[in-house]
């Protein structure tokens, strides 16, 4: 059903308007007003001739009648009607000229022309004209009181100094025609096809490339002179563009478009009804030739492929967060977000028993690594025997410390922060042993991107024979909805962006520092005041 709707939306069909739409859009008001005034003048003269015999000539010249048909007044509608008739004929000629200048072809030729428009490559061009104004003088002669007086007139003339043109080079991004298909044109005797052209971008890469070329051209030419006139547009190569076409399904046009019929109706002041009938019998088709730039970035076969344009790549942060809440997308947490998620990770095992503590495996390596390429995290359905390890390293865990850059509490609170990561720790505090050579080193940061061999909280891999399966062998994997609910705490903590979290933390830390500074300054002032009082009072013990 969706495919049928999409196919219908991508098809253009001509439609014949009803009589009310014709009157509202193309009412031909000038022709209608002239026709009505001519008819009124004709009835006025007819009434005077029938009622008072104003134009018979049998009445004596010295007898004057009073009223609208008196002598003198009876010629007003005739003169006014003749003037209106001339204006009416000029308006009819102007309307007929528009039809004559319109391109009239067969339906087959019109479809071939539209196909040529769709297959022709686009040309998006820019033109600039740099100019300045030059101050000039000239001698003019003026007359005052009949005497000729010469004067010097100062005027400014525009001088074009530089002209340049360029066009959009789309070899890298590529293009494709996405115009609609035309159907059912042969069903109507006359079809008025209105053509237009435009271009769109498939992704931000193509739009950025277009804007860079356009800005570069204008920036290079705007320094040529004082002023710059800009022109830009779109053409189609090797095809002349026509805005309107009349297409006939027969070799000869219909009778209401014949010039003899048109002038016959116009002479008898019936041009307006003929025009309304012509518009009512003519189907209208609005067709737009659309060129899409950036197809190479969407084609997997192209070297410039960057993936399809998604909705999230064009939305701002508010819409992206709303989409996350609605569709529950998951984002890999950053270092700062991990440091802020300590309590959530510690409590995730109690709130959701299906989520197990991640037990990485430390592989034997001679040096301390800064990446997690050798850290194997157990996932759903994995076993401790799935790792092809040679011999585990006996490494003594050391207590996990919070990053110095993310620590805003006192030094005594570091042990409480380390105890909050209980899900990552399996040994007791008594069993922690740190090499003596590393005890006095500064605090190290906990990073997901890199966990060294001295990282704390990861128990050693024991004998592979006593490993336990995380799930039963015959237990199927959980469905997608269950997996979403399992990761709900992580998702809830990632609603806010990292920038907002860091801003709130820095704001709170700055407030604490300000309060501490104010307290220390106040205490210093009090001490200074007390010292001054003691110095002023020598008898004070």
Curated annotation (Swiss-Prot):
<dbReference type="GO" id="GO:0016020">
    <property type="term" value="C:membrane"/>
</dbReference>
<dbReference type="Pfam" id="PF14857">
    <property type="entry name" value="TMEM151"/>
</dbReference>
<feature type="transmembrane region" description="Helical">
    <location>
        <begin position="73"/>
        <end position="93"/>
    </location>
</feature>
<keyword id="KW-0812">Transmembrane</keyword>
<dbReference type="InterPro" id="IPR026767">
    <property type="entry name" value="Tmem151"/>
</dbReference>
<keyword id="KW-0472">Membrane</keyword>
<comment type="similarity">
    <text>Belongs to the TMEM151 family.</text>
</comment>
<protein>
    <recommendedName>
        <fullName>Transmembrane protein 151 homolog</fullName>
    </recommendedName>
</protein>
<feature type="compositionally biased region" description="Low complexity">
    <location>
        <begin position="515"/>
        <end position="535"/>
    </location>
</feature>
<feature type="transmembrane region" description="Helical">
    <location>
        <begin position="254"/>
        <end position="274"/>
    </location>
</feature>
<keyword id="KW-1133">Transmembrane helix</keyword>
<feature type="transmembrane region" description="Helical">
    <location>
        <begin position="27"/>
        <end position="47"/>
    </location>
</feature>
<feature type="region of interest" description="Disordered">
    <location>
        <begin position="503"/>
        <end position="541"/>
    </location>
</feature>
